[in-house]
């Protein structure tokens, strides 16, 4: 499965403590689209969060997620590459 498009929607938060940097949409093989991946700046660096939902007991469960580390790294790398391309001066990536 190839990543054929990555679209970044940067979030300009008024709250200086907000960790959310952007929402991302990724297209695979020009036939499948995955919306609402989030780019977050955490204490250990920048990372992606897959789309999720909150359960009745308050836990968050991913709706979709990579099943191996190799694909997660490919996905994260494609997202970060596009983010830096669109926002060259706004982010020094400290990978988490």
Swiss-Prot record:
Q: What is this protein called?
A: Putative septation protein SpoVG
Biological source species: Borrelia turicatae (strain 91E135)
Quick one: a GO biological-process term for this protein?
division septum assembly
Q: Which NCBIfam families match?
A: PRK13259.1
Q: Which Pfam families match?
A: SpoVG
Entry's PANTHER family? SEPTATION PROTEIN SPOVG-RELATED
Q: Which UniProt keywords apply?
A: Cell cycle, Cell division, Septation
Q: Which domain of life is it from?
A: Bacteria
Name the job this protein performs: Could be involved in septation.
* Family of the protein in this entry: Belongs to the SpoVG family.
């Amino acid at each position: 499965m190839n990543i054929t498009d990555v679209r970044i929607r940067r979030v300009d938060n008024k709250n200086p403590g907000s960790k959310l940097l952007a929402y991302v949409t990724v297209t695979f093989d020009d036939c499948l689209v995955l919306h609402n991946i989030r780019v977050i700046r955490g204490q250990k660096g920048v990372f992606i969060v897959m789309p999720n939902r909150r359960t009745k007991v308050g836990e968050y469960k991913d709706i979709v997620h990579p099943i191996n580390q190799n694909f997660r790294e490919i996905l994260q790398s494609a997202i970060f590459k596009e983010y830096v391309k669109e926002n060259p001066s706004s982010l020094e990536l400290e990978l988490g």
